[in-house]
Amino acid sequence: MDRFDVPKEIGDITFGLLSPEQIRTMSVAKIVTADTYDDDGYPIDGGLMDTRLGVIDPGLVCKSCSGRVGTCPGHFGHIELSKSVIHIGFAKDIYKLLKAVCPHCGKVTVTEIKRDEYLEKMLKLEEDGGDPWTLSDDLLKEAAKSSVCPSCGEVKYDIKYDKPTTYHQLDGKSQKQLTSSEVREILEKIPNEDCKLLGINSRVARPEYMVLTVLPVPPVTVRPSITLESGERSEDDLTHKLVDIIRINQRLEENINGGAPNLIIEDLWDLLQYHINTYFDNEAPGIPPARHRSGRPLRTLAQRLKGKEGRFRHNLAGKRVNFSARTVISPDPRLSINEVGIPELIAKELTVPEKVTPYNIERIRKLIENGSDKHPGVNYVIKKVKTKDGKEEEYKIKITDTNKKMWVENIVDGMVVERHLGDGDVVLYNRQPSLHRMSIMAHKVKVLPYRTFRHNLCVCPPYNADFDGDEMNVHVPQSEEARAEAETLMLVEKHIISPRYGGPIIGAIHDFVSGAYVLTSSNFIKDEALTLLKSSGFGSELGEPDFVENGIEYYSGKSLFSKTLPKGLNLQYKAKVCKKCVQCKREECENDAFVIIRNGRLVQGVIDKNGFGAETGVVLNTIVKDFGSEDARTFLDSATKMSVKSMMLRGFTTGIDDEDIPSEAIQEIQDLLDKAESDVQEIVERYEGGTLDPLPGRGIEESREAYIMQILGKARDDTGKVAEKYLSKENHAALMARTGARGSLLNITMMAASVGQQSVRGGRVFRGYRGRTLPHFGEGSLDAKSHGFVRSCYKKGLAPTEYFFHAMGGREGLVDQAVRTAQSGYMQRRLVNALQDIKAEYDGTVRDSRGIIVQFNYGEDLVDPSKADHGKGVDLDKVFTKVISKYEN
């Protein structure tokens, strides 16, 4: 084995500061001139584009390593500063050090006893595998309190810090500004043995290195210039900044050598400090940012590293990849949940490498014959050729109309072709933001016409996708291992159960839910029943009719739906349409809300969101856990198709007339609202008369508002109950709400009865004019309508004042949503970064990458949430039902 092949392990990494000597040692050139190129366009020696620093122009050779563009990595230069300058990145640390050390002897201003005590603690921490530097902060705070140095007895002045890089020495009422040279002198006095106490590793850093006397100049390759369309060169922002630094540095040196007045030297020194500050960080607080001639702020060192667009997050943590596509998404209920519809245009562009074997050679010949423009075809043939020195090289040959016939004849075993994406290929499908595991899953390709990706609506919840213009990404795995891994671990059917709470996250939504209700609560003639069976993809026989009426054979939706259920399924549960009666009538429920499934047959009850809906689907949840994910996928595919078809057969529509309620209902609602307003008026009168009893723990005004909010909230709920009472079973708007397909009865209340009280900052509306919310109300009025109570419903329309209050509530909702999204996004980022190396081990403990135990028992109860049942470890009712049903059958 070659000695360089021996695997090496990094022991530890130490960060230090570059000393002036190190900067000069690693430098290949002293930069002395601000000019970059001469009149002929060649880099000037001693300038910022000096060829010793590396080359970016083809044809030029690096004078340091003799490399050309692409081979020369670039080399550092340096600028000798005329005066020392504070490094803005260490300005706060310098302030802490100046407060903690004696300006005369440089020692930390704590007693010998304290010093020994801290050193002992640090040593103990180090032996125990801890971080000794954590004690430094406590020591710095303690040392800053002393006014006399215990070591030399001299007076230690207090230090005042003005951002970004100014320090003052306070002597009573007077204060003296410390120059960066004076700051450096104090830091130079700190002995090495005290550095450890201050949190500085003196082997790799000294405190005075925080004040710069030499500035490293980055290689040319880090800051390449670009040539514009006009032929002019445009220099990088770092080069612009370095030009400013060199110019001011030269002027400062000339003025010092020429004996210029102190005032001029100080001004130039401050200017040099400003340019070096903005070179390191152009967004530092308290400094005006350096700008381009166009007014654009320069992107300097800190801006290139930090934030979303910085080097770490933009280029290292996240990168652009090949073999991916992105387009708008559309729904397609005819696709399986495992499938994704790929536009033919994309399928012809994205390729899969396939090795030619005796088993697939004929198929590949046909693909090559189609060429690269006709789907399914081949874009490239990869041929291996042996070179003279015996090495193998790969040649990638594009298939064109001129060479495809030749390749049809000459293709042989062992070659690799890059063929078009075809039906059945495995791809990864992703929607951003990727907030959980199911934001990227494996689907099987179905090539379709048009230009959008298509997927089944059941997979919308895990992706949080809708079809109002959302875009999604597809990634094509390029190796057999990757494809196998994606299909085994990431296929959609394997993720029906959410790892968050152990319930189905993939399931029926919207039309599927209301369709299932329509299906299981209706009866169908033979032709309709056959259409439903065919639509769901079943080849089974229809069987005997459920009943015959007037010579017509009828098949119940329940028996048709039963054909989608696996044999052996036994279940009892309450449907979403359940009215939550005081005493459940179970099998005798007049709303058909008690669902019984025996041996895979829907005996009683209707199927709605509680049956196979996303998040709450009891049937779906049971099938996944008892029969496996493949059966669950088959059930979901067939049941949703049947549901949609039943909607198409029966018809399902909603309009403004769904909010129509009879005149007696309207009168009942008006009476309730009148009573609520008079109750509010009574509360106001009691408040003004001083007879209102305050609630426990609240003031009189708070109590008044709580009483009013309670009255108005109850009024809206009561009006909703009235509206619901008069909305029939056939009312499609109410049906959608009751079955859990879309919306809630509160939405219907607001449309048909009353919108209710508008809330701003958790209470009634009080902001506006002095003493009143709007000029339409009397000053000091406290009644319901003057503080945001919207009596009208949406169908009737809002009065101008009501509309204004409604807009206030709506505006707060929008702002709140935007703020919450940003906050939760940032919190998730921090959580992910903190927890990224923590995992559950096979012994049940939770450990990080260093093997340190975080939890002795995973989750304290050793329960895998994805194996739990909606948060419960074991659902005993289900276990009993399963056992009883087994012996009943």
From Swiss-Prot:
GO molecular function per UniProt: DNA binding; DNA-directed RNA polymerase activity; magnesium ion binding; zinc ion binding
Catalytic reaction list: RNA(n) + a ribonucleoside 5'-triphosphate = RNA(n+1) + diphosphate
Cofactor needs: Mg(2+); Zn(2+)
Keywords linked to the UniProt accession: Cytoplasm, DNA-binding, DNA-directed RNA polymerase, Magnesium, Metal-binding, Nucleotidyltransferase, Transcription, Transferase, Zinc
Gene3D superfamilies per record: 1.10.10.1950, 1.10.132.30, 2.40.40.20, 2.60.40.2940, 6.10.250.2940, 6.20.50.80, RNA polymerase ii (3.30.1490.180), RNA polymerase II, clamp domain (4.10.860.120)
Biological process annotations from GO: DNA-templated transcription
SUPFAM superfamilies the record matches: beta and beta-prime subunits of DNA dependent RNA-polymerase (SSF64484)
Enzyme Commission designation: 2.7.7.6
Cellular-component GO terms for this entry: cytoplasm; DNA-directed RNA polymerase complex
Pfam families: RNA_pol_Rpb1_1, RNA_pol_Rpb1_2, RNA_pol_Rpb1_3, RNA_pol_Rpb1_4, RNA_pol_Rpb1_5
Top EC class of this enzyme: transferase
Chief localization: cytoplasm
Free-text comment on the cofactor: Binds at least 2 Zn(2+) per subunit.
Residues the record lists as binding Zn(2+) 2: 102, 105, 149, 152
Binding site for Zn(2+) 1: 62, 65, 72, 75
Residues that, per the record, bind Mg(2+): 466, 468, 470
Top-level division of the source organism's lineage: Archaea
Entry's localization field: Cytoplasm
Purpose: DNA-dependent RNA polymerase (RNAP) catalyzes the transcription of DNA into RNA using the four ribonucleoside triphosphates as substrates. Forms the clamp head domain.
Annotated PANTHER family: DNA-DIRECTED RNA POLYMERASE, DNA-DIRECTED RNA POLYMERASE III SUBUNIT RPC1
Family: Belongs to the RNA polymerase beta' chain family.
Quaternary structure and partners: Part of the RNA polymerase complex.
Name under which the protein is recorded: DNA-directed RNA polymerase subunit Rpo1N
Species for this entry: Methanococcus vannielii (strain ATCC 35089 / DSM 1224 / JCM 13029 / OCM 148 / SB)
UniProt lineage: Archaea, Methanobacteriati, Methanobacteriota, Methanomada group, Methanococci
